Design a protein with these regions (language model features):
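Asp-based, Mg2+/Mn2+-dependent phosphohydrolase catalytic module
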Residues: 2-31, 38-43, 50-62, 66, ...
Length: 165
C-alpha cells in the first residue's frame, strides 16, 4: 500500500455507505474534524452529516474525532455536540493519536477506518497506523496558509483518482 493512497476518495462523509463498511469488518470510525465533519473555523454541523453519525451509532459503530486542531475547547465542544469521543492536538501524520483513539474505542486497526480531508495528514497517518483510509473533499474552500501549500500537491496527486460522488 502506498502511504499517500486512500482506499477510497468520496465527495463527503455522508456519502460513505455504512453497510459496506460494516460488511468489510469495520466497527470503529476515526474522523477528522476541520473540513471533514465541519467547515474550518465554524461550529455548524451539516444536517446530513449529523444524520449519518446517528445512523452509524445505531448500526453499532464506535466513533472518535481525531483532530490536529490546537483549540481543544472547539474540538471538545464539537465532539460533545456530535456525541463523539475526541482527541485534539493529534499531530497527524504521526500515528500516536490514532492509536490512542483505537485504544479508547477498544478497536484494532483492522476494525477501523479513518475519514479525513487531507492526503498529507489524515491519509498518511491512517496508512502509517495500519488503518484503512477514506479521503473526502474539504467542506470549505478557505484553508490555513500552510494547508494551501499542501493542497497544491494534493491536487496533483489526486488527478487520476476518481472521486465517488
Amino acid at each position: 500500500m502506498r502511504i499517500f493512497s486512500p482506499k477510497r476518495y468520496v465527495a463527503s462523509v455522508d456519502r460513505i455507505d455504512l453497510d459496506t463498511l460494516w460488511a468489510d469488518g469495520k466497527r470503529a470510525i476515526l474522523l477528522d474534524r476541520d473540513n471533514t465533519l465541519v467547515p474550518r473555523d465554524t461550529e455548524q454541523v451539516p444536517a446530513a452529516l449529523s444524520a449519518w453519525l446517528d445512523t452509524a451509532r445505531a448500526k453499532g459503530f464506535k466513533l472518535c474525532m481525531v483532530s490536529n486542531n490546537w483549540h481543544r475547547d472547539q474540538v471538545m465542544a464539537s465532539a460533545r455536540e456530535l456525541g463523539l469521543e475526541a482527541i485534539s492536538h493529534a499531530m497527524k501524520p504521526a500515528p500516536f493519536a490514532l492509536k490512542a483513539g483505537l485504544k479508547r474505542l477498544g478497536a484494532t486497526a483492522d476494525e477501523a477506518v479513518l475519514i479525513g480531508d487531507q492526503l498529507y495528514t489524515d491519509v498518511w497517518s491512517g496508512n502509517f497506523a495500519g488503518v484503512d483510509t477514506i479521503l473526502v473533499k474539504p467542506q470549505a474552500t478557505q484553508d490555513l496558509w500552510y494547508t494551501q501549500i499542501f493542497r497544491i500537491f494534493e491536487r496533483r496527486a489526486l488527478r487520476d483518482l476518481p472521486c465517488e460522488e
